[in-house]
């Protein structure tokens, strides 16, 4: 599922270039929240800070719900958040979207430019959800569960619901996430 860089509706920077300029003009003063230290949203922020060469104040929360409340309330200014959480808030005008974090624009947010389009080629961040089981789970059971989940994810009504909130189904094996090289590999080392 893609992530979006979003801000409170009343924040001064409404585009990614304006936000970078604001962060450079006020180093360490612009407040970014995340769903928690080490979360996918926090990782997206740290990668973006490194790529854009900016310094911001990071405030980790205990999940997305309290972060979204404080973003809408003006206690934090910006954050990276999963499209499934951010989309209804964008549609209601409670937050604004500055950028999305996949290489190509998501179908559910076609008017929001990517971070890569706005001067940071190769930038990509996403959130994934998966099913896991015990280490010694029989291979036949793993295969059966994977097939059943893929079959459900292929259903038209499920695809429609996922599309409504900006979720993008990857399906398949979670092992690919761990064995495929990532453009992020080594970026923060």
Regions found by a protein language model. Give the residues of each.
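Short Pro/Gly-enriched coil loops immediately N-terminal to beta-strands
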Residues: 1-2, 91, 122-127
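Hinge/capping helix and adjacent helix->loop/strand transition within the periplasmic-binding protein
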Residues: 1-66, 115, 128-161
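Alpha-to-beta junction loops
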Residues: 26-29, 72-81, 94-96
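Short helices/loops that flank or line small-molecule/ion binding pockets
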Residues: 47, 51, 65-75, 84-92
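Ligand-binding "clamshell"
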Residues: 54-55, 89-100, 107-119
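Beta->alpha turn/N-cap motifs
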Residues: 64, 81-86, 101-103, 127, ...
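Mature extracytoplasmic/periplasmic domains
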Residues: 158-177
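Conserved small/polar residues in nucleotide/adenosyl-binding loops
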Residues: 178-183
């Amino acid at each position: 599922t893609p992530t979006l860089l979003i801000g409170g509706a009343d924040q001064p920077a409404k585009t990614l270039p304006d936000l970078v300029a604001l962060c450079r003009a006020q180093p360490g003063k612009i407040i970014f929240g995340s769903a928690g230290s080490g979360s996918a949203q926090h990782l997206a922020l740290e990668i973006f800070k490194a790529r854009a060469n900016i310094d911001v104040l990071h405030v980790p929360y205990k999940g997305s719900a309290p972060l979204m409340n404080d973003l809408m309330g003006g206690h934090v200014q910006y954050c990276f958040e999963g499209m499934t959480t951010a989309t209804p808030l964008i549609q209601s005008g409670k937050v604004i979207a500055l950028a999305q974090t996949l290489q190509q624009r998501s179908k559910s947010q076609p008017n929001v430019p990517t971070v890569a389009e706005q001067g940071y080629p190769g930038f990509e961040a996403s959130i994934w959800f998966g099913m896991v089981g015990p280490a010694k789970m029989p291979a036949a059971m793993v295969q059966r569960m994977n097939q059943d989940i893929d079959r459900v994810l292929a259903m038209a009504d499920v695809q429609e619901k996922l599309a409504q909130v900006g979720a993008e189904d990857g399906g398949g094996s979670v092992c690919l996430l761990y064995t495929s090289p990532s453009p992020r590999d080594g970026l923060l080392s």
